[in-house]
Amino acid sequence: MRFRFLEAIPVLVVTLLALSINTTFSQNAEPQIEEISVIGQFVPDEKRGTDQVSNVVGQEQFTRSGDANIAESLKRVSGLSTVGGKYVYVRGLGERYSTALMNGAILPSPEPINRVVPMDLFPTAILESVLVQKTYSAAFPAEFGGGVMQLRTKKSTDEFFWNVTSSIGGQNNTTFKDGFTLDGGSRDWLGYDDGHRAMSDTLKRAVAGDNKLKKYSVYDKQGVPMEDLTAIGKAFNNEYTFDSESLPVDTSFTTSFGNFNEIGDSRAKINYFGAIDYSNSWDSNEVQQNRWVPAGGEILSQQEELNFQGTENSVDLSGIFSVGLDLNENHNVRLTSLVLRKMDHRLSRTLGYIESSDDLERVELEWIERELSSHQLQGDHYFPEFNELVINWRYSDIEANRDSPDHRIYRYDGGELSSRGNGNQRNYSFLTDTTEDFGLDVSMVFYGPANATITTKFGGVISEKDRDSEIRRYGFAFGGPISYDLDLLQQPLETIFAPENIGPEGFYIREITRATDNYTAQNELNAFYGEVEFNFDDRLRFTLGARQEDFTQTADTFDLFNPTYGVQAKLEQDALMPAFSATFINNDHQFRLAYSETVSRPDFRELSPAMFTNPMTGTEVVGNPNLKITDIKNYDFRWEWYFGYTDYVSAGIFYKEFTNPIEASIQSPINRVMTFINAASAENQGVEVEVFKTLDFLGDLGEDFYFQGNVSYIDSTVTIAPEDRGVLTSMTRPLQGQSDWLLNAQIGYEPFSGTTATLLYHYYGDRVSQVGIETVPDFYEQAFGELNFVFIRELNDNWRVTAKAKNITDQRNEVRVSDYLVNGYFMGREISLQVDYTF
């Protein structure tokens, strides 16, 4: 399939360019004055002009709020929240119910078990805007529950500009305070490992061809001789203990530029845009962690008490370049290439007691590189003489990677190195997820009776996705008498695993990779849609649409060392999904109504019956091959009132009904392995209110001030069937990660003097963070509020200064089960100073 549509792209491009060039020459002829008809009205707000319930966040809001990435910015949209600092929940629904697109193309994910790309990967510096559409329309993928997030990258420009931005900042609990550090490679400051953490050459040679690293056995004549194992063990970097030193300030740098060139005497021109964004930040946290077990009735007994201390160094490095060919105002072709990178270097130590150890010390050293690279070729063509024919096409080749080299984990029990199988580990994992996508959208306009404007639209998408995930795990095994020397086992690991202690008399390296650690997966989507909009005199609009999707997905879990062992999970669907929306416009009031039927499909690993370990959480997970696709019915109503030039108020209600919703479950009280089930039913309903109002009613005092806010109340219920309950405590509960209340408020000061000041408040209510088991209630992340302040001063036409203060109140983040604390920590207050210069 891939090669068929790849071969078709040049034909399509050449054909459209030929038509465009012909149109260009025609337009260059002597112009003729024709009748001018007014068929619409000026729409200052994109969400006002659309036929769907939506929100748009653009550059103006990015600047006002001072948000560095899209995950921070989207939580300010009504009904949206951010979980874990990077996953966006729309109307309380998790990432499985949301779709992320970039310039129309489906995005792959660098995360091993998450289908949606984390939004913290996208800096606001490279994006023009983000459309969040909360009602379904047939032009978008049918995997839709909460909404679709359409990320729009910055485009080439029609004028010259060059901007440079630099900032410094810090946190009160991190900057100039002692934190964990560990020397690495020469390119760590760029977020690239230079090979310092890579497998040694001796290890690479030993495991080449998917060979397993194990001690030679005289029985099966397989394995590696002890002298070679000794050499391999000594070749590992003997670095386990990190330093404690004062942490530096956070820094960032961004530059963007653009220009255009005309092509001869024609109306054609080439324009281009480029940007580079870099940031280097530090974050230290101390987290209290507790575990509770039933003690009779509603009383819980503490089984674990731990103190987590960690430092994270994050480096973001992104670049984008876009070049466009505008043949005239009606025809353009654009090529956009970008690379988004985020490195997280995490060092942590956990101390305390657990069920199996009264004196535990657990240390983790983790380096993760995430990258998304994209190349997109797009064309937009408008033929007004052919019933206002519009043809938009795109081809995208996008790849997401996650690389975690030499992830080290070790623990001491009672002051001695643990002899458990997982007492010391050095893991290497790599994931690549590629998507190739071709899309076509065509629309035409016709005119009917009763001043009706009929817009027909049809198109299709052919998308192919391939994922390859590999993990190799190693650890030092206890062998000879040296490895049981109690005095030695109480020393730092650099002493325990010193070269003289590696060998037949001491420790030897072995492979502990699991049979289900590695998998490949693919899915293919062939989709076609049709849509008709009836617009009666810009007063009443009806949109009817349907989307046909042919979907196939396979996931193959395999044992690297036993080719005969493998488990395949397969999912197929061929379905038609309808969508309907209506808008009634009465002067400055709009009333919207929408209904649609959509789906949510199981992800790659959720279907596979092979047990695997989530490399991000360490949780044991096994899929369910009997999972069914979730069917969703969506109902929406919204009223909007636009008054003044920018002021508006809107209020809406929504209701969603789920058949066979997919939920996490724990089936066994012994091994507590997570799996997935189809719950009996689920409902999600809520109310959303938004307002933007200038405070000019206060007279001269308020004419430079505005208030912007939104509030959402969301109520959801998931019902678990008795046969699927397992050891879950609750048979009914809210959706995991869904807050009942979401609130955003902004008060801004924007005079014409070049000064801007914005006070922002974000609040989310209690939300289920983990389902309870064995009569322990569900775990709830407690309600949290964040207060930020952004001050911007334009000194002249070239210089601008921005000061930011984030999380001013520094409320404690807590997770509780009933009244018992599970974990708690302070994020810290953050301040920064930014300087912009525009040439």
Where are these regions (language model features)?
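Transmembrane beta-barrel wall of Gram-negative outer-membrane proteins
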Residues: 206-348, 371-375, 578-581
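Surface-exposed extracellular loop regions of Gram-negative outer-membrane beta-barrel proteins
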Residues: 105-106, 343-345, 401-404, 466-469, ...
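Gram-negative outer-membrane beta-barrel transporters
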Residues: 538-542, 648, 653-658, 673-770
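Conserved C-terminal beta-signal and adjacent last beta-strands/turns
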Residues: 424-431, 440-447, 453-457, 580, ...
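Short acidic/polar hinge/loop motifs at secondary-structure boundaries
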Residues: 76-78, 105-134, 154, 179-180, ...
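A beta-strand signature from Gram-negative outer-membrane beta-barrel systems
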Residues: 109, 121-167, 215, 838
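N-terminal periplasmic "start-of-domain" segments of outer-membrane beta-barrel proteins
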Residues: 35-65, 95-101, 105, 110
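Outer membrane beta-barrel strand-and-loop segments of large Gram-negative receptors
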Residues: 419-420, 431, 435-441, 487-494, ...
